[in-house]
């Protein structure tokens, strides 16, 4: 009896201590970093020159880390390519790389910097985390030697990886992730042989990490949420904005809502390549975001998040739409191009009404009312159901309400940043063949609309109030991962299309 009581006491004590040491909320920070680039050269520089460039960027990151820590942040995310920039060859990136060990080695570089060779960048990041008692997420390059015993070993005898690292508040390396889905011009890096699903636990939730282009694919992004059940995604990125559907703050906030997870996105700040857009996103609404194409300055964002976001019911994305009768009100369909994909459109000719447009298996239904019907602005409802083959190969189903660039219907789908028409209400749904649908609402001047819309359990994206600003787009962006072509295999249409239409911007650049 005494032993049983003692065990019960110990169990209760352990539960109380564990609850006391865990946090219901935490303060997240992301830093949009105005990266300092090395001199443009394809010739490898000396290790000393490479370290000098990296230290200049680390000086700026140090200021952001220190400021975030003083404001109570528990974790800070910094961007992809934030320490050395971009536009490298396989040879010219090499002086910037370090050997990054498996975190299972239990290593604090600040205390033991030479344990794995010359690792000055890891040492500095570790000391920054330790000195400021904060988790730091950074993106650097990893190098791993190989030989002929490995049939996949590159000719130069090494693997080079685009790598995210995480140091905890004591400076310990707790996570290392090698980017799986490399973008077209990331020839300086290798993809890992298998997707890495990287997680770590803290007193303020379970975290997963992936990088930039990974967000468009199932592995490891969806796996982290669906199978590993992380609370928060860490997302270093070097994202080039492409409207109307792939601006950074628009798509990243939509992914957080669609996957029902916290999402910390840190982008490079480099307006010359349309790189801007960072945010702290909760499943229900953005907590903080930044988009700035006008200045050349970085930006630190902080916001409070729930450590364990409240679970929400799974959305049946086709439930409502499958029971709606088509409403075309006599309008004629026309086609338009969005990022090389041919959409089927209907012009919204009235101040309000109900419209339906279909393509293949996808029918999109819209109910709406504008605040006024302007003669100088045209809006359209569009549908796309097909395989996207430019700068990656991935299957999409998209329903979108968008503003056309001009009153010429041929401009529907072109990039637009400003509008004048507000909407009193909207409700958008579609007969999606996937559970992976990401809801986007983007307002004039590239602004989000936190708290102004919601997704119902039956798959409707609808407004809660009149929009606070003019509307650029209201979109349901669906991904059918099972219909993707083979990984890392791009259609010949990619090169052909880029040659035929060189004015079209890539959505992500290295």
UniProtKB/Swiss-Prot annotation:
EC code(s) of this entry: 3.5.1.92
Signal peptide bounds: 1-22
Subcellular location: Cell membrane
Active site annotation, chain numbering: 80 (proton acceptor), 179 (proton donor), 212 (nucleophile)
Pfam families noted in UniProt: CN_hydrolase, Vanin_C
Annotated catalysed reactions: (R)-pantetheine + H2O = cysteamine + (R)-pantothenate
Prosegment location in residue numbers: 493-510
Recorded topology in the membrane: Lipid-anchor; GPI-anchor
One term of GO molecular function: pantetheine hydrolase activity
Annotated GO biological process: pantothenate metabolic process
List of glycosylated residues: 39, 87, 147, 201, 316, 354, 504
Residue span(s) of domain CN hydrolase: 31-307
Coiled coil: none
Function: Amidohydrolase that hydrolyzes specifically one of the carboamide linkages in D-pantetheine thus recycling pantothenic acid (vitamin B5) and releasing cysteamine.
Family label: Belongs to the carbon-nitrogen hydrolase superfamily. BTD/VNN family.
Protein name: Pantetheinase
Annotated source species: Bos taurus (Bovine)
């Amino acid at each position: 009896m005494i032993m049983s009581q003692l065990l019960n006491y110990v169990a209760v004590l352990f539960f109380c201590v564990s609850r006391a040491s865990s946090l219901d909320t935490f303060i997240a920070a992301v830093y949009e970093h105005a990266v300092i680039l090395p001199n443009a050269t394809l010739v490898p520089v000396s290790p000393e020159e490479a370290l000098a460039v990296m230290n200049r960027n680390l000086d700026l990151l140090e200021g952001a880390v220190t400021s975030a820590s003083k404001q109570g942040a528990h974790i800070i995310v910094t961007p992809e390519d934030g320490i050395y920039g971009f536009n490298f060859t396989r040879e010219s990136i090499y002086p910037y790389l370090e050997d990054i060990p498996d975190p299972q080695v239990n290593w604090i570089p600040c205390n033991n910097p030479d344990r794995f060779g010359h690792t000055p960048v890891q040492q500095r990041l570790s000391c920054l985390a330790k000195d400021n008692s904060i988790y730091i997420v950074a993106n650097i390059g990893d190098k791993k030697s190989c030989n002929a015993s490995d049939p996949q070993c590159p000719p130069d005898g090494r693997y080079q990886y685009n790598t995210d690292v995480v140091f905890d508040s004591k400076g310990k390396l707790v996570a290392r992730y090698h980017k799986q889905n490399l973008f077209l011009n990331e020839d300086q890096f290798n993809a890992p042989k298998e997707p890495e699903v990287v997680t770590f636990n803290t007193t303020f939730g379970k975290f997963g990490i992936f990088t930039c282009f990974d967000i468009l694919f199932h592995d490891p992004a969806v796996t982290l949420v669906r199978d590993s059940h992380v609370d928060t995604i860490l997302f270093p990125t070097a994202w080039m904005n492409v409207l109307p559907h792939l601006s950074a703050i628009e798509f990243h906030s939509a992914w957080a809502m669609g996957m029902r997870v916290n999402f910390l996105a840190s982008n490079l700040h480099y307006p010359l390549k349309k790189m801007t857009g960072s945010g702290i996103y909760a499943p229900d609404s953005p907590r903080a975001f930044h988009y700035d194409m006008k200045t050349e300055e970085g930006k630190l964002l902080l916001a409070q998040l729930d450590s364990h976001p409240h679970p929400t019911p799974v959305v049946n994305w086709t439930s409502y739409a499958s029971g709606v009768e088509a409403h075309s009100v006599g309008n004629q369909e026309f086609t338009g191009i969005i990022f090389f994909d041919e959409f089927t459109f209907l012009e919204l000719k009235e101040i309000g009404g109900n419209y339906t447009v279909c393509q293949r298996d996808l029918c999109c239904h819209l109910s709406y009312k504008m605040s006024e019907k302007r003669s100088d602005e045209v809006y359209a409802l569009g549908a796309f159901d097909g395989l996207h083959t430019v700068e990656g190969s991935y299957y999409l189903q998209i329903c979108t309400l968008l503003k056309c660039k001009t009153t010429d219907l041929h401009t529907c789908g072109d990039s637009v940043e400003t509008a004048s028409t507000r909407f009193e209400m909207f409700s958008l749904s579609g007969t999606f063949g996937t559970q992976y649908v990401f809801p986007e609402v983007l307002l004039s001047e590239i602004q989000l609309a936190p708290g102004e819309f919601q997704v119902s359990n039956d798959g409707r994206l609808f407004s809660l109030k009149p929009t606070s600003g003019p509307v650029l787009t209201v979109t349901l962006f669906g991904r059918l991962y099972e219909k993707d072509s083979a990984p890392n295999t791009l259609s010949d249409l990619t090169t052909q299309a880029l040659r035929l239409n060189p004015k079209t911007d890539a959505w992500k650049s290295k």
